[in-house]
Amino acid sequence: MTEGILLREAITDKYLKQYQVIILDEAHERTVNTDVLFGVLKNVQKARKENNMTELKLIIMSATMDVDHFSKYFDNCPVLYLPGRTFPVTIHHTKQKQDDYMFAAIATLFEIHLNAPPQEDVLIFLTGKDEIESMIHQIRTITKSPELQGTVQLRAFPLHSSLQQNKQMDAFTRSAENTRRVVVATNIAETSITLPGIKYVIDTGVVKMKNYEASTGLETLKVTKISQAQAWQRSGRAGRESEGACYRTYTKNELELLEKMTKPEILRCNLSATILQLLAIGVNIENFDLMDKPSKEAITVAFKQLKQLSAIKTTQSPQLTDDGRSMALFPLDPIFSRIIISAPEYGCINEILDLIAMLSTDNVYLEPNQNNRDVAYAQHNKFHMSYGDHFTLLKIYSQYRNANDKKKFHKTLKLSYSF
């Protein structure tokens, strides 16, 4: 199950009585729900002990994390190391700082391609779908040049979370004889999955990360430098099946200047949803034992937002209102929850549910390639509503729901399969 589901169970059962052992995997990712769950489970352990109940055992698993920090947080718990079956990976850094990591990655790819044996595949890390599609297009264009004719065939595949499932599977298929596969991926390929046949990794040293400015109340998605832990995680992808090599498009000095660990999400996000969940469990975040405590400003801003949404009575001594308790039951941003419980008053609950479902998916439009861009945009324009994007999304969903052949509807109108 996900962390969010377990947190919602804790709202109705503060002892989580049906569990005796809970295993938390990928702990190093430090998502908001992971960090909150750490604190909730510590409280559950303490409460069970005080009430002479069955002990709750926790097993925290991670491929790479700040072990001392975790052990100290969990009352100096013992640490067990399980060596993985990995092979040596040779690390290469650029001698000089690179101004364009995309260009450096492509140059490195073709240096490998022209010198390495066939069927030794390559994994390139980029920040997002737009960069990935751009690089795929450049790779395919370059491979058509006369200079590369007669060499090993190079086939490029994208890999990111909003890609259709059948397209994602292409990235997992081993290369055929006399071909080389290059997978261009986001950080989804760092820990969550293992790609067979990867011999070389090209690490651009950047990632797209969500940040929150409490002073403005705005969340942004920025390209930022990875941590040292991420750098080593990426390089390890080249040593899963045999000896490999990692080419970093940054210098060794730049590596040493990187943060040792990735900044936890709870320190760089809007806390209103987190605080709402904690209040529903009966916990005030100001007294809650978190591994890394958010700033006072971020907490204050979240309390103000919840007060504006009528989820809490006051910001000084926050207690949930009846509406707040209802809002906490939804696995949604509090703004969406507030809209849902208000919708019946305006007689538009069905439309609101449809709209929030559409807003909770990835981009509903398929990103067109160079060959069918005009056709795709023409299809997308059929849904355009002058009243705004929300009405456009409702129109798309309404037509989708009425379509007899859902797959044909997506394919013909160049829409994502995310809904």
Regions from the PLM with identified roles:
Residues 380-383:
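A short, surface-exposed interaction/processing loop segment used at functional sites
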Residues 1-346, 355, 376-377, 387, ...:
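P-loop NTPase motor module signature
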Residues 56, 348-368:
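Structured, non-catalytic alpha/beta "coupling" segments that mediate domain-domain communication
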Residues 367-375:
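A short, terminal or domain-edge coil/loop segment
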